[in-house]
């Protein structure tokens, strides 16, 4: 019997961990949307750990794309060029968009 393929969100998480590992421990969580109103996801990063939270109230594709966005933020935080949170772009600076563009395009080729 053919082994059942994991859900898209799990495949995306595993692909990111393997292909774009981070220099710290990473945990990925799904929370109910009432715990994070108006957000699909967020990331918390410190020197030893990264926590990514994605709302449960999304389909597999939307949750996967949100995970890629949050992973891109985490990768951006590891660059030697610091994020200027006070600028107009803030955390969505040109480096973030380069990282996000690369990841989302590769992911679309995988599915």
Model features per residue range: what roles?
Residues 4-24:
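Zn2+-dependent metallopeptidase catalytic core
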Residues 8, 64, 68, 88, ...:
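Hydrophobic (often cysteine-bearing) scaffold residues that line and stabilize catalytic clefts
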Residues 29-51:
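Catalytic zinc-binding patch centered on the HExxH motif and its immediate surroundings
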Residues 32-34, 72, 81-82:
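Short, solvent-exposed loop/turn segments at secondary-structure junctions
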Residues 50-67:
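Short pre-active-site segment immediately N-terminal to the catalytic Zn-binding motif
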Residues 65-78:
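Active-site recognition of the HExxH zinc-binding catalytic motif
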Residues 81-111:
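Post-HExxH zinc-binding segment in Zn-dependent metallohydrolases
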């Amino acid at each position: 019997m053919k082994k059942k393929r994991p859900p898209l969100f799990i495949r995306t998480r595993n692909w990111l961990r393997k292909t774009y590992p981070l220099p710290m421990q990473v945990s990925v969580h799904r929370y109910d949307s009432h715990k994070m109103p108006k957000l699909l996801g967020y990331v918390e990063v410190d020197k030893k750990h990264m926590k990514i939270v994605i709302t449960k109230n999304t389909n597999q594709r939307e949750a996967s794309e949100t995970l890629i966005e949050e992973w891109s933020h985490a990768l951006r935080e590891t660059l030697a060029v610091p994020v200027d949170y006070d600028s107009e772009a803030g955390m969505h600076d040109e480096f973030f968009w380069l990282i996000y563009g690369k990841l989302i395009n590769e992911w679309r080729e995988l599915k």
